[in-house]
Amino acid sequence: MAILSDRDIKRYIEEGLITIDPLDDPERQIQPSSVDLRIGNEFKGFRVIRKPCIDPKDPSDIESYMETFHVEDGPFIIHPGEFALATTHEYIALPEDLVARVEGRSSIGRLGITMHVTAGYIDPGFHGRITLEISNIGKMPVALYPRQRVCQIVFETMTSPAERPYGHPSRDSKYIGQTRPQTSRIKDDYEIRNSRL
């Protein structure tokens, strides 16, 4: 596997192999080996609820534990210890022979903000807006503005196209085509759904 350089990223975009829409400022967004992505204007945070824990086997919809915030003018403030979901402003589509990773920008990380907790890997065949799992591990609240560059996507070639890429009918591709912050669909995992635990 090899990481795409800026010239290869531009070529893949020009040839329609990678979709990044909108890519409003390619000169600023395309870096030597990545593309800076911006945060959208919709955020989800956990409500304070009276439950001992989130249990994947509980039939309650995890969505009901979340509150949605739309930010048009001004920032979304994330406080120390808080967790929120958002999406990239850009819609991304990958071919069947590329994978991608999302990493936080160092300028954001130096404020104590992480952009993904564990889900930084994007499978071949994915298309949609990427859900960001944002945490403030610092000691001060931080303002995040819609369309602010907060993360970067790195593309890697595969040795061959995936036989069953993300979105294939035989896969449980729970997040294909997402356009809004998507809460966990862990209850749809095979082992949970079929009481294998």
Curated annotation (Swiss-Prot):
Gene3D superfamilies reported for this sequence: 2.70.40.10
- The UniProt annotation puts the region (Disordered) at 161-183
| Keyword Hydrolase included in the entry's annotation | yes
Q: What residue spans carry the Basic and acidic residues bias annotation?
A: 165-174
Q: What are the binding positions for dCTP in this chain?
A: R105, S106, S107, I108, G109, R110, D123, T131, L132, E133, Q152, Y166, K174, Q178
- Residue(s) at site: Important for bifunctional activity: G120, Y121
User: Which residues are annotated as active site?
Assistant: E133
Q: Which GO terms describe its biological process?
A: dUMP biosynthetic process; dUTP biosynthetic process; nucleobase-containing small molecule interconversion
Q: Which pathway or pathways does this protein act in?
A: Pyrimidine metabolism; dUMP biosynthesis; dUMP from dCTP: step 1/1
Record flagged with keyword Coiled coil: no
The protein's Enzyme Commission number: 3.5.4.30
Q: Name one GO molecular function term.
A: dCTP deaminase (dUMP-forming) activity
Q: What Pfam families has UniProt attached to this entry?
A: DCD (PF22769)
CDD domains, alphabetically? trimeric_dUTPase
Q: Which PANTHER family match?
A: DCTP DEAMINASE
The entry's family comment says: Belongs to the dCTP deaminase family.
Q: What is the designated name of this protein?
A: dCTP deaminase, dUMP-forming
